[in-house]
């Protein structure tokens, strides 16, 4: 396993543990005497005014639209690297996790629609259980230390990256509301400039980020979700230049600690604080949260494992070396941890609707993700080999 992937896995695992702490603090604050402090923090007004440009939003939306764009920038960099040189480079490496990820998105969405397909409003949340939170999943996996084979970690990483790419496409196609053609036109010009810079071999990361900032503002104003700007910029930054530098790798290396230890935990803190006041058992067991929880806990492993098994049996893909189907099933349960990505989609799906929909959707996400984490961890403990003693070389 390359040093890049090894470092990535370490940071994601540690970041996942911080995510858990941030979410727990948010839940405690939202259901204690500190609820007012918590809400006031999220409602802090933040404005940027440059000439005729005026962007005014509460802190919560700056986190969701701004900081999450940085997260998606890193996702774009990761996906490009893995497609060109990493665990997804070449057909043989990419097919197995790609098919698994496809099943892991389709089955949860279909199960959700079985619960909520008849309701025009809640139907909009069909993509909520389709997401996997890679940081959380790797954080749980890290609890088992060196018992986890390297190939299994890389499989989870590749599957989650493809899953992220699928979620990005879903956001672009299904969660875009009113569109400003003027802003989209300027955004298209910015994308064309980024593509030209890439073609000409421009290696200055700052130049891409400056154009990317313009792109972010244009996409934000266009009505398309602004986080997509991050993905586009990530794909446009060169992986290598003529002088053998890697602007993409350098930026990813610099961003990763900020994303793992600050941006995602801050997003979790800002969005996981669900007030349980007024929440009833009948509401918690209603179709919306049950559809999400069932989609995550049942749909994810059903889709990932079934599609993986069929791909191998039909000769479409090969099972990675030193991995068996018991381990694949355990990891597929772990992929039911949707958390940050699912909460992000829920905020888009039910934006401007009854606040109760967002509340119960988050509760469904927490229920499904927690169950998947506990059961997935327990299954991994059963199917993985015994602890391997570390060998010190002197």
Swiss-Prot record:
Its main location: membrane. It catalyses: Na(+)(in) + 2 H(+)(out) = Na(+)(out) + 2 H(+)(in). GO terms for biological process: regulation of pH. One of its GO terms (cellular component) is plasma membrane. It is found in: Cell inner membrane. The chain crosses the membrane at residues 14-34, 59-79, 95-115, 125-145, 154-174, 179-199, 213-233, 254-274, 292-312, 328-348, 363-383. It is a multi-pass membrane protein. Signal peptide: none annotated. One of its GO terms (molecular function) is sodium:proton antiporter activity. Keywords: Antiport, Cell inner membrane, Cell membrane, Ion transport, Membrane, Sodium, Sodium transport, Transmembrane, Transmembrane helix, Transport. Disulfide bonds: none annotated. NCBIfam families: NhaA, PRK09560.1, PRK09561.1. Na(+)/H(+) antiporter that extrudes sodium in exchange for external protons. Belongs to the NhaA Na(+)/H(+) (TC 2.A.33) antiporter family. This is Na(+)/H(+) antiporter NhaA. The lineage of its organism: Bacteria, Pseudomonadati, Pseudomonadota, Gammaproteobacteria, Enterobacterales.
